Design a protein with these regions (language model features):
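Structured binding/interaction patches within domain cores
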Residues: 1-155, 167-170
Length: 170
């Protein structure tokens, strides 16, 4: 399925007010980098203005992987996901870790193939995020996350980490 077809499905699910079906479609058909980016956008929208510190550290790893996918960041995600302090973003870190391809878990080890199971991990992350919303607000939050899913698949992907704007002298 291409991104235009997925976008049409998401639009239909938004209009039908069936966000769970839209979340399922996104997690089954979106490319991995766009799934991870959607997870980051969703977390930042739920935890506005700033995520809890432990979640922020995990989101930083996931967002950096979107900007520059590398095995080093996949290993960092795997290590952070095993940490006792990691919270809900553990799901998103595992989506990065299991984004497919060979992964050498340590310097002495051998490269082990990892399946691309980013979709199920991202789905778990999104549903856990929604569970933190009060029940009355959950339907609105679900619709908002589907709008973010549309942004993640229709807008150009970021290619470099954002930088702080330079102050303009007046």
């Amino acid at each position: 399925m291409n991104l235009d077809q997925l976008d049409k499905i998401l639009v239909a699910q938004i209009e039908a007010r069936t966000p769970n079906n839209g979340i399922d479609a996104m997690c089954q058909h979106a490319p991995t980098n766009r799934l991870i980016w959607w997870g980051c956008l969703s977390a930042w929208s739920i935890w506005r203005p700033t995520p809890p510190p432990v979640e922020d550290a995990a989101l930083a790893i996931a967002a950096r992987w979107v900007f520059q996918p590398s095995d080093d960041l996949r290993r960092a995600a795997a290590l952070q996901a095993k940490s006792d302090t990691v919270g809900m973003c553990k799901w998103l870190l595992q989506a990065v870790q299991f984004s497919g391809g060979q992964l050498k878990t340590d310097e002495a080890g051998i490269a082990v193939p990892t399946p691309n199971v980013s979709g199920p991990y991202t789905k778990g992350f999104i549903h856990n995020l929604l569970a933190t919303s009060p029940p009355v607000e959950r339907a609105t939050a679900s619709q908002n996350l589907l709008q973010l899913a549309r942004q993640a698949i229709t807008r150009p992907m970021p290619t470099a980490e954002p930088t702080q704007p330079k102050p303009q002298l007046v």
